[in-house]
């Protein structure tokens, strides 16, 4: 699994000093360091970003990402003869970053009287809210404005069905099939993302009937990393943001698992997270407002580098 980001320590002066600079109420109170720190924390909490999505930063409202549909062809050529030219078939996919926002209020008593850890609580709360919604959007987003389009609704990805009415995981065959499907498209499986209930079911599968030895176990990992999970050497990430109410035939409690080459999934970020504080918005209730906005989109330059295993039922 990719190593987690090393978080920059918070300043330890005034409880919200990381959010405040000189200026008038309603202006931008977040220095560049605070926005960068916030995005680092967000990235470490987002399964999509942490799994290795290729991050592309832009300052434009739209970004064209090249996509090769078929490669140029090489041929053995006799000495002195013309080389037959071939051109790759290519087009572009256009990313249109859309706004994801979170807003929270803190009482001025909390801001004024709490220990310095209050700033850490606010930062963590907002980062977690944005990261969870970002992950939901990366995998489940409909593409209907203002939502971005997630992997589930991207055209051109590969699919592997667990059957007409779905099925629970009883072995690792679906993952072997998914990794094989990627290899057949000259892609490499570098990440597997599933709902926690799927991993729970997998860890209960035993090597043989009557055996108590599980097929999969969590690796210990370093204390700062948490458990290491993998299937056939491919890192596994868990997120609760995958739907568990998909319909597969007569089943209505299915979910999907995604196996992909992470650098073929592009997270396009329109500038950094923007953090603002305003003491006037909730003047009548004596509270301070903290707002975070982020503009992002997701595009696939090679959709075949993603396999969706659909129709996975609870064990």
Model-predicted segments: where are they?
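Alpha-helical scaffold segments that mediate packing/assembly in large oligomeric complexes
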Residues: 82-184, 308-315
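Composition- and surface-driven signal marking solvent-exposed, interaction-prone regions
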Residues: 118-123, 205-208, 249-250, 282, ...
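Short amphipathic
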Residues: 67, 100-106, 238, 292
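Short loop/turn segments at secondary-structure transitions that flank enzyme active sites
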Residues: 69-74, 101, 110, 132, ...
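Assembly/oligomerization interface modules of large self-assembling protein complexes
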Residues: 2-102, 147, 171, 305
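Short helix/loop capping segments that flank catalytic or ligand/cofactor-binding pockets
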Residues: 73-77, 86, 113-115, 201-204, ...
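Extended oligomerization regions of viral-like shell subunits
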Residues: 59, 64, 144-284, 288, ...
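Hydrophobic, glycine-enriched assembly/anchoring segments
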Residues: 282-315
